[in-house]
Structure formats: structure tokens, C-alpha cells
From Swiss-Prot:
The lineage of its organism: Eukaryota, Fungi, Dikarya, Ascomycota, Saccharomycotina. Keywords: Glyoxylate bypass, Glyoxysome, Lyase, Magnesium, Metal-binding, Peroxisome, Tricarboxylic acid cycle. It is an enzyme of class 4 (lyase). Pathway: Carbohydrate metabolism; glyoxylate cycle; (S)-malate from isocitrate: step 1/2. This is Isocitrate lyase. Mg(2+) binds at D172. It comes from Candida tropicalis (Yeast).
């Protein structure tokens, strides 16, 4: 076998040079809040010899500076989920960032072409492919605009609005679509496809749900930290300044995969009746007897009533209140001062303290209360999300708590809780269409909600599915009118408003780049072509006259 000869001294010198470059990179202000648990040497060893500069990293830099400015000014980058190139081209005129929703991709753009609700069960490359779809459109419209402007005089350019089509894209990475290696590969896909940032949530991958569905199963705190570390490590290997958004679904979570992390112990539910027995064993025994359906559900309901399901601190407080103790309030305070949502007290430590205060071993068993699938019962909430947000902060650029309602007071509680420990932490907020906005607040409060959240530190806010909903509304409205009044529906409710509002897609040939392509044809054919798309006979000449006929 013929091996390639290599200069060992040069190889070592190149390695040391790269290590020095990485250390210098990490010393930049961009990384002042970022914690890494690996070394520059580790990253240099994982890189190949061919250096590839990804343009998405420039977009990451742009996004970071954008959010830095918003943070300083207490303002907000607010956006919504884009479905296609039409969306991003129109959004670019008014909004300074773009969101790509996994929910929307699941229903409209899976690479399997099979629609689905938001369960993240689509192929792993689905959202990265949508990012690339939109990123290529951004690049194309940017090229098209540049040529059009540079064909103008300076005076004409001065009077022609400039559109920044290259708005940074933040995309949905769900739970990472698997373990650590899957997350590393998924991150690489996003970097290659044009994402400036991605978000990842602390749900278990096999049971992932939309943030506004029931039955969410969390992973332990450290497991999600490992995911965030994997994202940063992958980005470091590929030389990217990718932003990472850590989402927690703990506010409404009801299950967790494991009790391994002591930071989760406060929120894990157990049985307080030693006579209740093991639920999973009871259910398995019933199924072995041929019991299913409503009867099986009844058995679970009866067990739940009997088990006395509680959090451990609730069991301790109930014992103190019901027992023969002097100065009960002082005992409760002594316990809750050391055992609370943000204390990170392990269950072992909490039990020891409870026995010191009550003289009893209070029965509490979280194993017998496990769900049939083996998951532990969990009672999240805002303070749980604060605990997780604080834990994730050193490894993420932004923190996002998924919530059930657009509740300003809850958003403030979360922001205040996180910032009490990490004062300069950036926050993100989902202005979800799953909320009933008109029921939640009056119109005047809706108008100021984004700004009010911005004052709390929510520098990036987004309506996940506005692209889906606005498209559905527009098409439903047009299809309805078209079915009744034919071409009048198009002429009067689509085309004429496009003309009056200056929506450039009315000249869809030009919008799609026909002039730009004609320029390419002329360039490679010596300046003359008889096959120009926008030559004599093009029907868009009709739009030089914009007055509608009545």
C-alpha cells in the first residue's frame, strides 16, 4: 500500500497553530457567557485538514449583533414561521429575523412527504432541508436585487428602497432526533444548510410532543445540558458561530425518563400510601387476565385515588400539619428553606432533613408510581422552568420556556427567576397561535405584548405558525370567493390589491428572477439573445397600466 509522506514537524506545527487560533476565537466577546467543558486541543483534533468556511456563520454573527443591539435597547427581534420563499421575501421588508418551525415542516414539508402532527417523527433532514430552501431563496433574491440596483444610476438607487433579504434564520431542532451523535450530525446539517441559530428542547425524543400538547416527557437536566454541549462542540468543530437556544417544556411536563439528576428530585411525584402497591405491576397483572380498555383505565384511576400521589415536600408539610408538633410553621420553614424548587436538594438529603425535623421516616415511593411506559411522574411549573433555565444558561445563547398561556406575570416570573442568577441572559418567547389571544387579553394589550416582554429581556419572539395560518386564511378566503364569482375574485381581491399596495409579486416573472436570468443569457452569449424571457411579447407589459377597469 502506498502511503502519502507527511512532514511530522509541519503536522505538529499546523496543529499547534490551529489550537492557538481556536483559543483566540474563544476569547472573543461573542463567547463571554459560553461555558465549554472541552479544550481547544479536543476540537482541533476533531477537525479535518481541509478548512471550510460556512456562510451560515456570517449569518450567526449578524444574528448575535442584532440581538445584542436589541438587548441594549430593550427592544425585540420578532418574527414568525416562514413556509416558503414567498414568505421570506415578503418578511424581509419588515422583520429582521426568520423562524423555521418543525411543526410547519411536519405538516407541510416532511422529506418523506407524509404529513403529521408535531411529533418530530419526520426524517432528520426535514427542517434542515427547509432551511436550505429558504436560505437559497434569500441568496437568490439578494443577487437579483444587487444586479437590479447596480444597473441603476446612483440617483435612482438613492430613491429605491433597499431590502435586506439575508435575514438570519433560527430553526427548530426538536429534541435532536436521537442521541448525542445524532445531535452533532443534525447541527452540522443546519450549519451547512444556512441556519444562523437552532433551538433544542428538553423532551425525550421518542415521545416528543408539540409544546401545547399533553403527555410531554422530559429528560433529566444533565441530559439536556449534554445536548447543548453537543451542539456547541459540533459548531466548534465546523468553525461556526451558530447560536443555540435552549427550550424547556418543564412548565407543563407530567413525566420524566429518570430520577438520576438530583436537580429534578423536588419535582418528582411519589406514592405516600404504603398499601397502594406497584401501579405497573398491577396493570400488567390486569392485562394478563385479559382486562383492557375502560376497565383497565378504571383500575389505574382507583390506584391513583388510593396512592396519595404527592411531591415529597408536600408529604412532609402534610405530616407536620397533621402531627403533634409544636411550632409547626417554624418546622415547615426550616424544611422549605433547604428544600425548594431552586435548592437542588437531592431526595436523600430531603428525607434525612425530614426525619431530623419530624422524627419519622415519611413514606414516599416514586418507583411504584411510575407510568406503564416506565416514566416517572413529574410536576413541573414556572419555578421548575426557572431551575432548568438557570442550569442551561451557561451552554446556550437564549433560554425559552414553553408556556400554556400568554401570561405576562408568568413570563415576568420566569425572566426574573433566570436573571436573578444570570442577569445578562437573553430570553426567547413563543407567541403561539395555540393560545386564544382574544380570550387571553384585549386588543390594546395584544398590541403592546411584544414590547412589554422585551422590557423583561425577551429579545427574540416569534409566532411559530403564522406562516401556516395566514396562508390557510388567504387561500380559504380566495377559494371561497373564486367558487362564487369566478375571475372577479382574482382580479378584484388579489391582483388589484397587489398593484395598489406595491406587492412586487404581482409581476411574478420579474419577481422570480426572469430579468436576472436574461442578464446571464446575454452575458454568456456576447450581449445578444433571441430567447430572453422578458423580451417583446412578455405579458407583464400589461402591468404598466395599473388602473383597474370598473
Amino acid at each position: 500500500m502506498a502511503y502519502t509522506k507527511i512532514d511530522i514537524n509541519q503536522e505538529e506545527a499546523d496543529f499547534q497553530k490551529e489550537v492557538a487560533e481556536i483559543k483566540k476565537w474563544w476569547s472573543e466577546p461573542r463567547w463571554r457567557k459560553t461555558k465549554r467543558i472541552y479544550s481547544a486541543e479536543d476540537i482541533a483534533k476533531k477537525r479535518g485538514t481541509l478548512k471550510i468556511a460556512y456562510p451560515s456563520s456570517q449569518q450567526s454573527d449578524k444574528l448575535f449583533k442584532l440581538l445584542e443591539k436589541h438587548d441594549a435597547e430593550k427592544s425585540v427581534s420578532f418574527t414568525f414561521g416562514a413556509l416558503d420563499p414567498i414568505h421570506v421575501a415578503q418578511m424581509a421588508k419588515y422583520l429582521d429575523s426568520i423562524y423555521v418551525s418543525g411543526w410547519q415542516c411536519s405538516s407541510t414539508a416532511s422529506t418523506s412527504n407524509e404529513p403529521s402532527p408535531d411529533l418530530a417523527d419526520y426524517p432528520m433532514d426535514t427542517v434542515p432541508n427547509k432551511v436550505e430552501h429558504l436560505w437559497f431563496a434569500q441568496l437568490f433574491h439578494d443577487r437579483k436585487q444587487r444586479e437590479e440596483r447596480l444597473n441603476m444610476t446612483k440617483e435612482e438607487r438613492a430613491n429605491t428602497p433597499y431590502i435586506d433579504f439575508l435575514r438570519p434564520i433560527i430553526a427548530d431542532a426538536d429534541t435532536g432526533h436521537g442521541g448525542i451523535t445524532a445531535i452533532i450530525k443534525l447541527t452540522k446539517l443546519f450549519i451547512e444548510r444556512g441556519a444562523a441559530g437552532i433551538h433544542i428542547e428538553d423532551q425525550a425524543p421518542g415521545t416528543k410532543k408539540c409544546g401545547h400538547m399533553a403527555g410531554k416527557v422530559l429528560v433529566p437536566v444533565q441530559e439536556h445540558i449534554n445536548r447543548l454541549v453537543a451542539i456547541r462542540a459540533s459548531a466548534d468543530i465546523f468553525g461556526s458561530n451558530l447560536l443555540a437556544v435552549a427550550r424547556t417544556d418543564s412548565e407543563a411536563a407530567t413525566l420524566i425518563t429518570s430520577t438520576i439528576d438530583h436537580r429534578d428530585h423536588y419535582f418528582i411525584i411519589g406514592a405516600t400510601n404504603p398499601e397502594s402497591g406497584d401501579l405497573a405491576a398491577l396493570m400488567a397483572e390486569a392485562e394478563a387476565k385479559g382486562i383492557y380498555g375502560d376497565e383497565l383505565a378504571r383500575i389505574e384511576t382507583e390506584w391513583t385515588k388510593k396512592a396519595g400521589l404527592k411531591l415529597f415536600h408536600e408529604a412532609v408539610i402534610d405530616e407536620i400539619k397533621a402531627g403533634n408538633y409544636s411550632n409547626k410553621e417554624a418546622l415547615i420553614k426550616k424544611f422549605t428553606d433547604k428544600v425548594n424548587p431552586l435548592s437542588h436538594t437531592s431526595h436523600k438529603e430531603a428525607k434525612k432533613l425530614a426525619k431530623e425535623l419530624t422524627g419519622k421516616d415519611i413514606y414516599f415511593n416514586w418507583d411504584v408510581a411510575r407510568a406503564r411506559e416506565g416514566y416517572y411522574r413529574y410536576q413541573g411549573g414556572t419555578q421548575c422552568a426557572v431551575m432548568r433555565g438557570r442550569a442551561f444558561a451557561p451552554y446556550a445563547d437564549l433560554i425559552w420556556m414553553e408556556s400554556a398561556l400568554p401570561d405576562y406575570n408568568q413570563a415576568k416570573e420566569f425572566a426574573d427567576g433566570v436573571k436573578a442568577a444570570v442577569p445578562d441572559q437573553w430570553l426567547a418567547y413563543n407567541l403561539s397561535p395555540s393560545f386564544n389571544w382574544n380570550k387571553a387579553m384585549p386588543a390594546d394589550e395584544q398590541e403592546t405584548y411584544i414590547k412589554r416582554l422585551g422590557q423583561l429581556g425577551y429579545v427574540w419572539q416569534f409566532i411559530t405558525l403564522a406562516g401556516l395560518h395566514t396562508t390557510a386564511l388567504a387561500v380559504d378566503d380566495f377559494a371561497n370567493q373564486y367558487s362564487q364569482i369566478g375571475m372577479r375574485a382574482y382580479g378584484q381581491t388579489v391582483q388589484q390589491p397587489e398593484i395598489e399596495k406595491g406587492v412586487e409579486v404581482v409581476k411574478h416573472q420579474k419577481w422570480s428572477g426572469a430579468n436576472y436570468i436574461d442578464g446571464l443569457l446575454r452575458m454568456v452569449s456576447g450581449g445578444v439573445t433571441s430567447t430572453a424571457a422578458m423580451g417583446a411579447g412578455v405579458t407583464e407589459d400589461q402591468f404598466k397600466e395599473t388602473k383597474a377597469k370598473v
